């Protein structure tokens, strides 16, 4: 039996660490939290200074029994849960269950799961930091008080299964506020004039800028006609040439929030998927002869700090690969409000390149690792240098301007460009070499009518970014928050953008009227600040809870008395039940909308809502191909005669047969491109627009 017992959260992490520590250490997993507040009751005694009642989580009995058995036999027990508040709380709960000494230096933390980092952490064990535990306890108790007080009111007055919470209610508010902006938006007409100009054999474009040396707004067609009427022929003169050198710095390495945003934009990953794959990379990948190694640092962080060791290694890689001129000379600065002493998300070793790791990784693991690796290495590279040119092109009182840009030195852009910045403005726009006084010819003057557009709906990436900018919640809360408002059917995704549902708007209105603090951004931000102060030891968690609950309790009492019951009418489905003849209605279930008999519970008939795509089933030639959704909300295509016909396709059949093998053709989408391919052979053709 090993003298030392080490407890971590997951089997994958346990497996990796045990290989590093050797035979004197036994590493086992707690499988996450082992204690929590009970689900069947509040679990917080508001009459006894908010004392929490912790119980062993249902189903964790065998795990706890196993932990106690090993702890009894070990000389030393080390708690090696994750290096954040949640991990500190897990360590504390384990310490209580195993009856370890409070003052024992048995807590070990490491930011990356590599041999050196793990061994070093065991040389410096410390006591459990109760300030961090208390900050996590305060968050948990706050969320319990909010959820278990508001939810029953919503169940009683609106509909069963609803919920509200400090972060999810603010996230829902953001989506609804944006929708109201869009509804209330009044488009305004405006015009632009673009000119195409020729100098010798070169052509370039410029936009109308000034009339009589002043900006002139083109609000109507009359304004445009005033400008075009003032033009005299096609000859223009270059009246000013401005040349500048512009430096562009690389983005910082990833935090949790920026990783979720960039993975959504570049890889089309949902926040939850990003965190799941990142956890796999952090906990350890089997590299065969090299053993199991954690490929990235801890993925729940809002710090952009980088260790000196990592900087040195990155500089060495960049120098060897690109040359000395590509290494960064600037000093990276941390972000205000970084939680604890974490690092940014980075590869545990720059020398483990994505290409070298590809054969050991799944497709998703490789794509995310490549993104993290490239972003980090680019952050340690030299800035890009751009040459910009601005030309003023004048005829009389009318001035056009052309802007051009060329890359003089690519620097970090050799490796990586952040998606949000990868726009038209960054693309090289070469202008002919012109000097003041040169003459150019206008080959085309093109007015165009436009209308102002409403603000766009939130994508998942933009919602995460906004939550972070407003300091709502923590990096670890973004993914579950977005998950919750979708599962509750408060919002739905349309073209990858969030739209509030009728139910979401009803719930929001009730919470807004009776629990205004819960959806108040400033209140939520202040609460996060107080949680930080608890972690720093500046205030007690009980004082923070009491400051909130004393007024919140009155809001709950008022809501119970005054909130009116809301009837959410079922939407008619437009057809009758084939069993009893009663009208069918649209219901919302766990996996979306479905049809149910209005005569429930006497008749329990239900049907999936299907949408015909106007194509006959290629298998039975009798049914129609209909669009369906899987339990994971992924669209697929099946036969309307199911279960008699079991035809299924992830790609959309188009109603034509392959000219090579006579099997059915499908529409296949990859990223932004769509093509028609054969479901059987290698035939393909361009999709018709």
UniProtKB/Swiss-Prot annotation:
GO terms for biological process: DNA topological change. It is an enzyme of class 5 (isomerase). GO terms for cellular component: chromosome. Residues 328-356 are annotated as: Disordered. PROSITE patterns: TOPO_IA_1 (PS00396), TOPO_IA_2 (PS52039), TOPRIM (PS50880). One of its GO terms (molecular function) is DNA topoisomerase type I (single strand cut, ATP-independent) activity. Gene3D superfamilies: 3.40.50.140, Bacterial Topoisomerase I, domain 1, Topoisomerase I, domain 2, Topoisomerase I, domain 3, Topoisomerase I, domain 4. InterPro entries: Topo_IA, Topo_IA_2, Topo_IA_AS, Topo_IA_cen, Topo_IA_cen_sub1, Topo_IA_cen_sub2, Topo_IA_cen_sub3, Topo_IA_core_domain. Residues 129-557 form the Topo IA-type catalytic domain. The record marks 33, 139-140, 143, 148, 155, 300, 488 as: Interaction with DNA. Keywords: DNA-binding, Isomerase, Magnesium, Metal-binding, Repeat, Topoisomerase, Zinc, Zinc-finger. The active site is at 298 (o-(5'-phospho-dna)-tyrosine intermediate). This is DNA topoisomerase 1. The lineage of its organism: Bacteria, Bacillati, Bacillota, Bacilli, Bacillales. The gene is topA.
